[in-house]
């Protein structure tokens, strides 16, 4: 399930949760996410955008997964922005990819697949120079 996905992702990535909601969801998220995951609540769209910019200024590559139009600025600012949608016709136009909400548990698989694709592209480019 989701807890297993986040445990797997935690091994290779820093997970941070930015939410526009209040802290009423803290206990639910803490039960679902790996221990030590940074949770930041009551975030306005501008604050999410600034948070992403600050991470990038620290030299980090940022992938953001968002579910609403209020995430558009942060999705556009991130190195990779993924919009989660239950209806693929309703999504943020600022994203790089759209992921059907029912497929969210496959996020790690898609990330591995994209890394393999990048490796293939780099190898093909190198071979084309020979």
Q: Can you say where each PLM-predicted feature lies in the sequence?
A:
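Bilayer-spanning, highly hydrophobic alpha-helical transmembrane segments
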Residues: 122-130
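Conserved ATP-binding TGD loop and adjacent catalytic N/P-domain core of P-type ATPases
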Residues: 1-123
């Amino acid at each position: 399930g989701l807890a297993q996905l986040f445990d797997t992702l935690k091994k290779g990535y820093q997970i941070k949760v930015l939410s526009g909601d209040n802290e009423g969801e803290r206990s639910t998220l803490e039960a679902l996410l790996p221990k030590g995951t940074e949770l930041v609540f009551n975030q306005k769209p501008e604050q999410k955008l600034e948070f992403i910019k600050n991470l990038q200024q620290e030299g980090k590559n940022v992938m953001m997964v968002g579910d609403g139009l209020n995430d558009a600025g942060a999705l556009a600012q991130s190195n990779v922005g993924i919009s989660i949608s239950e209806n693929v016709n309703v999504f943020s136009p600022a994203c790089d990819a759209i992921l059907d909400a029912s497929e969210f548990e496959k996020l790690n698989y898609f990330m591995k697949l994209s890394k393999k694709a990048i490796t293939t592209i780099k190898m093909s480019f190198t071979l084309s120079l020979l």
